[in-house]
Design a protein with these regions (language model features):
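A generic structural signal for short, non-catalytic loop/turn and secondary-structure boundary residues
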Residues: 158, 172, 212-214, 263-265, ...
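Oxyanion-binding "anion nests"
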Residues: 208-253
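A short, compositionally biased
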Residues: 156-163, 237-239, 330-337
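Dual-mode signal for accessory low-complexity, basic/Gly-rich regions
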Residues: 240-309
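Active-site bordering "gate/hinge" segments
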Residues: 1-218, 223-226, 339-367
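Internal helix-turn-beta structural module
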Residues: 295, 300-366
Length: 367
């Protein structure tokens, strides 16, 4: 992923609600939970120390922790703590002093680290929610092959003018969301940060994505408490949510948030998985599965988009929130069909959560 690594200084970042307490004497290792944090320590901090540095030609491997942001891709605080419980500064002590920075925590930090890597020149990766399934599948693959597959799908979809998605609900309704992509070059998340250019990968990788220019229609969503709703999209913005089933208070809270800070409803991404992987129950891997698609609202500057944190009324709202459509995650909705239009060409991309013949042929090409 990070070739060349010779001479690179590496550190590992994670997060806790009380990092000073958790890091002092590494007390979190004796506490319940903290699966991602313990994996960061065991497989990366100790893995580098016990042979990894020698194999890669790297040094460092230090573990640091910051206060958990409780939001996807929110800017990180400047304060963080080392294994002795001593407080340090990201801008003074971390970003200028490490060549490769790995973030393995509760929430994604791809957006803030992407902004900082351009300022300080490091390379890195974010691997939030890392569990044993991810370690043994999405992170245990040949990333040259992941990159090649992502490129095959990217070429098959690049310069798309529009994508339409039909969602079939259990009550028989079919909702359609139409996304205007303006013929833009498709991008890929392929996991490789090779060379010396500053970049931050999102791992596990394997997706093709676009930043929508416009969007209209409706699509369903599933809230964290299991409530199901229909979102109305007008001029790229989610305007309102309507209850399908579950808790009306959840819908009301979302509508209040949309009224209070409309940028939280702006669509910032359309993505398609390109890999065959097992379900991990973490969106970071599951959105990379072939046959799934996802939309995201909010911040998208790390994807080359125009939605930056300063545009939100409240800092805590400047998240990048993925809405994944996958059989295990949204069994109440079927992605009946995804269609791409590119000039005079029209292709089906997904049918009933399965990649279309067009996509399978693209993946088979050049092998």
């Amino acid at each position: 992923v990070f070739t060349p690594t010779e001479g690179c200084r590496v550190c590992i970042l994670t997060d806790f609600d009380d990092p000073a307490e958790a890091m002092t004497g590494l007390s979190f290792l004796e506490q319940e939970g903290h699966e991602a944090q313990k994996n960061a320590f065991r497989y990366f901090h100790e893995g580098l120390k016990n042979g990894g540095h020698e194999a890669l030609g790297t040094s460092g491997g230090d573990l640091f922790a910051h206060v958990c942001t409780h939001g996807s891709n929110l800017d990180l605080p400047d304060e963080l703590w080392n294994a002795e419980g001593r407080q340090l500064s990201f801008d003074k002590d971390i970003y200028p002093n490490y060549d490769i920075i790995l973030h393995i925590g509760t929430y994604s930090a791809t957006a803030p680290l992407t902004a900082k890597c351009k300022e300080f020149g490091f390379r890195g990766a974010t691997m939030h929610g890392m569990n044993d399934v991810i370690l043994n599948s999405g992170l245990a693959v040949d990333y040259e092959e992941v990159s090649a597959d992502a490129e095959r799908v990217r070429v098959a979809m690049t310069n798309a003018d529009t994508v339409e998605i039909d969602f079939a609900l259990e009550d028989g309704r079919v909702l359609t969301a139409s996304l205007d992509l303006g013929g833009q070059e498709a991008q890929k998340s392929h996991g490789l940060c090779q060379g010396k250019a500053p970049d931050v990968a999102n791992l596990p990788a394997g997706e093709v994505y676009f930043v929508p220019r416009d969007a209209n229609g409706q699509f369903p969503t599933k809230y964290e408490d299991g409530t199901l709703g229909v979102l109305d999209v007008v001029d790229r913005d989610v305007k309102r949510s309507t209850l399908i089933e579950g808790n009306q208070a959840t819908i009301d809270a979302h509508n209040a948030r949309l009224l209070d800070d409309p940028m939280t409803g702006t669509l910032g991404e359309l993505g398609f998985g390109t890999q065959v992987l097992p379900v991990s129950y973490q969106d970071i891997q599951d959105e990379k599965v072939l046959g799934t698609c996802h939309l995201a609202t909010g911040r998208d500057d790390h994807l080359g988009g125009d939605i930056v944190p300063e545009m939100f009324k409240k800092h805590e709202n400047s998240t990048h929130d993925d809405i994944l459509f996958a059989p295990h995650k949204t069994p109440n909705f079927n992605v009946k069909e995804v269609r791409m239009k590119r000039g005079d060409q029209e292709e089906v991309i997904i049918e009933n959560f399965r990649p279309s013949r067009y996509i399978m042929d693209a993946l088979a090409a050049g092998r």
